[in-house]
Amino acid sequence: MDNEENEVIDLTEILSAVRQHLLKLIFVTLAAALVGFTASKFLMTPKYDSSALMIVNTRQDVNANVTSDQINSATKLVSTYSIIIKSDTVLQQVIDNLGLNLTYAQLNKRVTVAAVDDTQVMKITVQSDSPEWARQVCEQIITVAPDVIKEAVEAGSVKVISNASLATEPVSPNIKKNTMLAAAVGFVLVIGIIVL
């Protein structure tokens, strides 16, 4: 019984303390949110993604009838083709073709290749602070990759089903998320100070 009374008293005291410092709580929360918004909007460099889709086939004659076994085999080949696309054989050629002032390792970090929902479709994504640069590099990758893959694997092919996109909105920073996170940190900080 005493424990219950103590808990009620403690909760009442906490709520009373919060009410006494309500203006401070609101001010700090809003100030923290403003800091988060300002940092995201003006201090962080926006990053843009450009993506293209390619479909993997186990045979070079893409017009022939395709069996379910061939589709399964093509799905398994996606990981192999992903490694080839990110290899220096492809990316160095992209660097040379576009005259990029980047090393292979630097470009490799900006490129991701992944299967789309465990299908035979690959998504190639290039990230940059310039949406046009990202699109150009992504477009060059899907231009160079098919011939390199065909030569390396000797059986099978890849076909572009969606060309490189031009981003209109950055993928990061997430201004709304960062603002809310900063506000939450400010709120919790003040609550902690009040309670302690």
Regions found by a protein language model. Give the residues of each.
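Hydrophobic and amphipathic membrane-targeting/association helices
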Residues: 1-196
